Swiss-Prot record:
Residues 251-255 are annotated as: ACP-binding. This is Beta-ketoacyl-[acyl-carrier-protein] synthase III. Pfam families: ACP_syn_III, ACP_syn_III_C. Belongs to the thiolase-like superfamily. FabH family.
Length: 323
């Protein structure tokens, strides 16, 4: 029987500091009503001074390992999705690897912005299916507060910091009845790179830069691309929207999430929504939302869980999981 990646456990970490919409009114010209109406966001977490992406990632990884009942020394692959690494190099994943006391296997970063966790999950899944890894840590971690222009009210109100992680283990399985990742689907279209980007980098400006976004254009592409990749994932497994137990989308904007759910004819009660208290945490948003739904008892053994995201590039993707 072929190998399949089973999610054994998940973990999350959110910085202690909470920044509310009311707090933001003292930084930029905005209001709670303006932000909630357009995004659904009420608050977000912000990393403390000296608290880096690797710190968030490590905390989420430790929580995931504990939840899975897996010892760190069993891990032979770490794939960390982030657009806000500690340094240009080495990979933030290698820092996490060292802090966990892991000295074997591979550890590397993946950069697909808000789609990063789905990309990282797909990569780890394929390592496992190929027999090149047995136990993988997949992490999404971001400190987007460090790349925001805090004078731009159209972007600084959207993002937050955090990290989420899952532990994958190779197990035998096939078909849609067995537990594990059923399929992953990745896409990108670089023609639209200038609609969502950071205006800095080591080879261009030698600076970190700030996030820039043409929000309305991103929204239009997101609604279409996410609907298509979700349909692709369902068709690949001979399933219909009615078979989905839970939709765990990238938490970018409540309007995008609700639009995707409507296209799938999914009742809102089956959509995991955390954007109101997390904001957009980029690659961390899906594992943070998934972990919340697992730990509060919504996601149960045997459920079909659909993950989907779109990010800068554009990149987008979906993963279908039998929990």
């Amino acid at each position: 029987m072929p190998l399949r990646s089973v999610i054994l456990g998940c973990g999350a970490y959110l910085p202690a500091r909470v920044l509310t919409n009311e707090d933001l009114t003292r930084i930029v010209e905005t209001s709670d009503e303006w932000i909630v109406e357009r995004t659904g966001i009420k608050s977000r977490h912000i990393a403390a001074d000296g608290e880096n992406t690797s710190d968030l990632a490590e905390a989420a990884a430790r929580a995931a390992l504990a939840h899975a009942g897996v010892a760190a020394e069993e891990v032979d692959l770490i794939v960390l999705a982030t657009a806000t690494p500690d340094q240009t190099f080495p990979a933030t994943a290698t820092k996490v690897q060292a802090r966990l006391g892991i000295t074997r296997g591979a550890a590397f970063d993946v950069q697909a912005v808000c789609s990063g966790f789905v990309y990282a999950l797909a990569i780890a899944d394929n390592f496992i299916k190929a027999g090149q890894a047995r136990t993988a840590l997949v992490i999404g971690a971001e400190t987007f507060s460090r790349i925001l222009d805090w004078t731009d009210r159209t972007t600084c109100v959207l993002f937050g910091d955090g990290a989420g992680a899952v532990v994958l283990r190779a197990e035998e399985g096939e078909g849609t009845a067995d537990r594990g990742i059923l399929s992953t689907h990745l896409h990108s279209d670089g023609r639209h790179h200038d609609l969502l980007y950071v205006d800095g980098g080591p080879s261009t400006t030698q600076t970190v830069g700030h996030l820039r976004m043409k929000g309305q254009e991103v929204f239009k592409h997101a609604v279409v691309n996410l609907a298509h990749v979700v349909e692709e994932a369902l068709a690949a497994n001979g399933l219909s929207p009615a078979d989905i137990s839970w939709l765990v989308p990238h938490q970018a904007n409540r309007r995008i999430i609700e639009s995707t759910a409507r296209k799938l004819k999914l009742d809102g009660s089956r959509v995991v929504l955390t954007v109101d208290h997390h904001g957009n945490t980029s690659a961390a948003s899906i594992p943070l939302a998934l972990c919340e739904a697992v730990h509060d008892g919504r996601v149960q053994r045997g459920d079909i869980v659909l993950l989907e995201a779109m990010g800068g590039g554009f990149t987008w993707g979906a993963a279908l999981v039998r929990w």
